[in-house]
């Protein structure tokens, strides 16, 4: 599975339009999220992943990087190109 540090991702995020998939639950997402992120909770991902463009690279984030790693594994098995964000939103809050 491909991974990127949050710092490296954040530099890209500030300069480019990226597809960011946030797999935290809705209440977590509503409390704090990165602008432009799409919320597809891991608990519902098996039913909602079809909303994602298969021809696009997707960065996947959660709180710490654990749920996003599971989401990346699932999405990769479905044929999506995904990169896990190490450290997740916890790393963002520490910026």
Spans of model-derived segments:
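Short, surface-exposed ligand- or partner-binding patches at beta-edge/loop junctions that are enriched
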Residues: 61
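Rhodanese-like catalytic fold shared by cysteine-dependent sulfurtransferases
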Residues: 1-19, 26-57, 66-95
């Amino acid at each position: 599975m491909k991974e990127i540090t949050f710092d490296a991702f954040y530099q890209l995020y500030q300069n480019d339009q990226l597809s960011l998939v946030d797999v935290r639950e809705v209440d977590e997402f509503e409390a704090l999220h990165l602008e432009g992120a799409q919320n597809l909770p891991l608990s519902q991902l098996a039913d909602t992943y079809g909303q994602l463009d298969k021809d696009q690279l997707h960065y996947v984030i959660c709180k710490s990087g654990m749920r996003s790693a599971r989401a990346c594994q699932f999405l990769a098995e479905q044929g999506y190109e995904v990169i896990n964000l190490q450290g997740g939103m916890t790393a963002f809050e520490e910026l």
